[in-house]
Design a protein with these regions (language model features):
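Active-site helix of classical SDR
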Residues: 127, 164, 172
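Conserved glycine-rich cofactor-binding loop
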Residues: 13, 18-22
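Substrate-binding pocket helix/loop in short-chain dehydrogenase/reductase
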Residues: 103-104, 108-116, 209, 213
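C-terminal substrate-recognition "lid" of short-chain dehydrogenase/reductases
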Residues: 86, 221-250, 255
């Protein structure tokens, strides 16, 4: 069941990093169903082609682009691919991310750098690469970055990811103010644990913590990928025309519950 008007995003062009799977793919699929043309960016060409095929099978317009968000020149290329294939770029979704559970005392410098590079540096590189095109969008440009509530709370084993996400939150607020004169809206979405994603599987299910973590959510369950996709549509659509510098928390109330030792992950 779709809750938005048909063709709500018609005429818009979106670039989604991490678009080959998980939340990035869910967002791209929903955008395409609502009329947006999409560029899917990721490092795994096979995943991107599979995702693009599924979107095309539903009538969507999509182009896969193999690239690493840690490489600024490659992100410039991704933006150029959007312009060359669809004539514009109106929406940037930063969904590429890296995370793993590791107590800080065991975290290697390389592990720290990897997450910071993908999450924080990658988000900045994508924003910078997209700026000149977003500022001439006829729909008012949108930047939507997927973060988590790790940046707002102290979660054991996630110092690296929490620091990266807090950095993205701060970056997004700064860009929201800096780029407001260009009518570019910069917002973030903070998902909670989402069923069917690699992150939830790796951090909770594979470690036998899924049932426990679901109980920590105020609504008593994990979210669905469509919950995050719907939030992204809201911010990308005319409903978000007066929203910038905001963080939309979509976690079923998870972050409001304290972290205790038996649910520290």
């Amino acid at each position: 069941m779709h809750i938005f008007a048909e063709r709500l995003l018609a005429g818009r062009v979106a670039l989604i990093t991490g678009g080959g799977s998980g939340l990035g793919f869910a967002i791209a699929r929903e955008f395409a169903l609502l009329g947006a043309a999409c560029v899917l960016v990721g490092r795994n060409g096979e995943k991107l082609e599979k995702a693009a095929f599924e979107i095309r099978s539903s009538g969507g317009r999509v182009v896969p682009y193999v690239g690493d968000v840690r490489d600024y020149s490659q992100m410039q290329g991704a933006v150029q691919a959007a312009v060359e294939n669809f004539g514009a770029l109106d929406i940037l979704v930063n969904s590429a991310a890296g995370n793993f559970y590791c107590p800080s005392k065991d975290l290697t410098p390389n592990g720290w750098r990897t997450v910071i590079d993908i999450d924080l540096n990658g988000t900045f590189f994508c924003c910078k690469a997209a700026f000149d095109v977003l500022r001439v969008s006829k729909f008012e440009g949108r930047v939507i970055s997927i973060v988590t509530t790790l940046g707002n709370t102290g979660w054991p084993g996630h110092a690296h990811a929490g620091a990266a996400k807090a950095g993205i939150l701060s970056l997004s607020r700064a860009l929201a103010v800096e780029w407001a004169e260009h009518q570019i809206h910069v917002n973030t979405i903070s998902p909670g644990p989402i069923a069917g994603t690699e992150g939830t599987s790796r951090l909770y299910e594979q470690r036998g913590l899924a049932e426990l973590q679901a109980r920590r959510v105020a609504l008593g369950r994990f979210g669905k990928t469509i919950d995050i996709a719907n939030a992204a549509v809201y911010l990308a659509s005319p409903a978000g025309d007066f929203i910038t510098g905001a963080d939309l928390v979509v976690d079923g109330g998870r972050w409001l519950n304290y972290v205790c030792k038996d649910s520290a992950a």
